[in-house]
């Protein structure tokens, strides 16, 4: 018998993927005009007002600024997140959304690998086989015998996936003692402050035509965050996490609608292998807690 909250949770996850895909499309649109660290800053600055309102509405301001917060871990996660988003934005300048998503889907495999040295978890041999198969999918997607996809942008997105995995693992450590509100607030603040400092010397004035994009960036990111929290609140991670891969369908659609780009067979085949490996790991790791805060 299915969990009573599964349908609601799956619907929330699908909505979250739609919101985050639209947000990434906006990041790609901005990446052609502004430096990567500035786009990171704009992502954080645009979302900060909504995050503050949400924290106040939830009456969690005291929790967010508690003296018992694990500040070093929050700082580490903030640095990793800023680097991750800047690299991902840099990659989007030359890659389509579907190509970028195919590479970032390797993150669950990396998270499983990192859980051994950092979280002291035991990974069964069959999981290592799934990881190896998933990495084979990356090779297929990159098709290293050609230069079309094995580019600086692709490498940047792969490094961004590693950063995302690190951020997720650090977030799992923090979430053992702190609520999700602290992760949401300080991750957003890190993007706003860190991105602003690193882009100050190269800051480009915001074009009037791009202000609606920034509003869209804030709204889609915020709604996506609420939806993904709702998804994991009403069901087990193993039931809803596989639906995160529905983002690839949105990426293909957005690529076509806005850039008339279609992923080739290598990207789709590699993506299918990576997704299959990721779903296997997610389904097998049902008891493990998952972090639901996405930048």
What are these regions (language model features)?
Residues 36-49, 90-107, 150-163, 207-221, ...:
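Structural signature of hydrophobic alpha-helical transmembrane segments
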Residues 88-90, 107-129, 249-268:
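C-terminal transmembrane-helix exit sites in multi-pass transporters
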Residues 28, 36-37, 51, 146-206, ...:
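Transmembrane alpha-helical segments that form core, pore/gating elements
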Residues 126-143, 266-285:
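Hydrophobic transmembrane alpha-helices of multi-pass small-molecule transport proteins
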Residues 8-16, 62-87, 152-160, 205-223:
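Loop-to-transmembrane-helix transition segments
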Residues 34-83, 163-167, 186-201:
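Transmembrane alpha-helices of multi-pass small-molecule transport proteins
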Residues 101-106, 174-189, 225-256:
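Helix-helix packing/entry segments at the starts of transmembrane helices
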Residues 17-22, 52, 78-86, 108-113, ...:
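Hydrophobic/small/kink-forming positions within alpha-helical transmembrane segments
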């Amino acid at each position: 018998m299915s969990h009573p909250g599964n349908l609601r949770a799956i619907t929330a996850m699908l909505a979250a993927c739609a919101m985050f895909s639209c947000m990434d499309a906006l990041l790609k649109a901005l990446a052609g005009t502004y430096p990567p660290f500035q786009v990171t800053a704009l992502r954080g600055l645009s979302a900060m007002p909504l995050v503050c309102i949400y924290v106040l509405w939830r009456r969690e301001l005291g929790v967010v600024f508690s003296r018992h917060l694990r500040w070093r871990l929050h700082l580490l996660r903030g640095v990793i997140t800023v680097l991750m988003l800047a690299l991902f934005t840099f990659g989007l300048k030359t890659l389509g959304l579907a190509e970028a998503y195919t590479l970032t889907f390797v993150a669950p495999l990396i998270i499983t690998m990192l859980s051994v040295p950092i979280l002291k978890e035991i990974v069964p041999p069959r999981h290592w086989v799934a990881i190896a198969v998933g990495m084979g999918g990356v090779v297929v997607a990159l098709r290293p015998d050609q230069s079309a996809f094995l580019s600086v942008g692709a490498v940047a997105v792969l490094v961004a996936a590693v950063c995302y995995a690190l951020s997720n693992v650090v977030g799992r450590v923090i979430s053992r003692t702190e609520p999700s509100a602290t992760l949401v607030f300080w991750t957003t603040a890190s993007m706003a402050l860190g991105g602003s400092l690193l882009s100050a010397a190269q800051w480009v004035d915001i074009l009037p035509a791009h202000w609606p994009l920034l509003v869209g960036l804030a709204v889609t990111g915020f709604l996506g965050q609420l939806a993904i929290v709702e998804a994991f609140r009403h069901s087990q991670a193993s039931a809803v996490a596989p639906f995160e891969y529905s983002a690839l369908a949105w990426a293909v659609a957005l690529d076509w609608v806005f850039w008339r780009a279609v992923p080739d067979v290598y990207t789709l085949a590699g993506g299918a292998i990576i997704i299959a490996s990721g779903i296997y790991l997610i389904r097998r790791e049902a008891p493990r807690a998952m972090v639901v805060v996405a930048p």
